[in-house]
């Protein structure tokens, strides 16, 4: 299970059985769950006073404990609807940010146990991503993983089944979305919701102002004028989005550089040889690999299915709990 700020993915028997937004809709009076995942996201930013939609995770860690518990329970229910073949006691491996404090780790395992987990193992996300990408994490050579999620970016150097140096920053996909929201308001005077900003990011988001042949079409944004509230149509091109995302992408660059500074020279040589792996939804930002490569002079590879690499790795770890037990807690 990859419990993410933006999406939660559950893998069971090597299949992705749940891939839903990490959103839950609750009744404001009783705090009962009304909807979870995609259904709740459809309600997000569209609710009246009796319903509140919550994103229980912020910056990669649990911000709203009871909402998170309800969300996990709701998503786990999706896995086995109806047939109670495997009884409620489940073994779970959950990916957590490598910068988590003891309290934050405790919150995740408690939530999982309340949501019917019996043996709950936690694995650090960069480690899970490495296993999911197919890197031999037990080999005596250095590999670097950059996992850019919704709430946090995890950068880790892995060797001999352990994390040698890690850097976890709370700058990630959500910040890119917020940058776009702020930019549209400031530059074009158009109010856009968080979801609209996310659509813009997916349609024309870029880390480079020159994408060459990969350039996406302009995206037409509809929204109210911030001042007059009249409807507007604004075409947005990827160059301007690249400019508005520049500062946030630079923060990620600097975090990668500072992780490299803390890497022992022997492992550094391995990383230059093997390249650096990009995982997480942020790895899909157009031109990010080329921009990082240009800045850092080490080749970057995008994982083949970056959105699911952490969940896949957690799934593999669950199947081989005995082999990977030293990676989990």
Identify the function of each model-found stretch.
Residues 1-148, 156-276, 283-329:
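Nucleotide/phosphate-binding catalytic cleft detector across ATP-hydrolyzing
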């Amino acid at each position: 299970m990859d419990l993410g700020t933006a999406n939660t993915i559950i893998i069971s028997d090597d299949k992705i059985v749940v891939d839903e937004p990490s959103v839950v809709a609750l009744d404001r009076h009783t705090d009962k769950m009304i909807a979870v995942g995609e259904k709740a996201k459809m309600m997000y930013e569209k609710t009246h006073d009796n319903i509140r939609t919550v994103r229980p995770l912020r910056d990669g860690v649990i911000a709203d404990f009871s909402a998170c518990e309800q969300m996990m329970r709701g998503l786990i229910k999706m896995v086995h609807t109806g047939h109670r073949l495997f009884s409620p006691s489940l073994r779970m491996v959950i990916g957590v940010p490598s910068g988590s404090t003891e309290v934050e780790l405790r919150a995740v395992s408690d939530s999982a146990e309340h949501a019917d987990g019996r043996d709950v193992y936690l694995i650090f996300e960069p480690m899970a991503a490495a296993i999911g990408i197919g890197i031999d994490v037990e080999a005596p050579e250095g590999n670097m993983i950059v996992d850019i999620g919704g709430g946090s970016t995890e950068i880790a150097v892995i060797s001999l089944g352990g994390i040698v140096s890690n850097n976890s920053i709370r700058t990630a996909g959500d910040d890119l979305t917020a940058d776009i929201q702020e930019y549209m308001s400031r530059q074009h005077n158009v109010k856009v919701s968080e979801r609209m900003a996310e659509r813009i990011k997916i349609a024309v988001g870029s880390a480079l102002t020159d994408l060459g042949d990969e350039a996406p079409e302009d995206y037409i944004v509809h929204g109210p004028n911030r001042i007059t509230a009249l409807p507007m149509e604004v075409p947005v091109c990827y160059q301007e989005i690249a400019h508005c995302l520049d500062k946030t992408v630079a923060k990620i660059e600097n975090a990668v550089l500072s992780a490299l500074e803390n890497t022992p020279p022997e492992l550094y040589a391995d990383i230059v040889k093997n390249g650096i792996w990009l995982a997480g939804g942020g790895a899909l930002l157009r031109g990010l690999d080329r921009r990082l490569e240009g800045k850092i002079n080490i080749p970057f590879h995008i994982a083949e299915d970056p959105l699911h690499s952490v969940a896949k790795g957690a799934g593999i770890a669950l199947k081989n709990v005995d082999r990977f037990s030293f990676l989990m807690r």
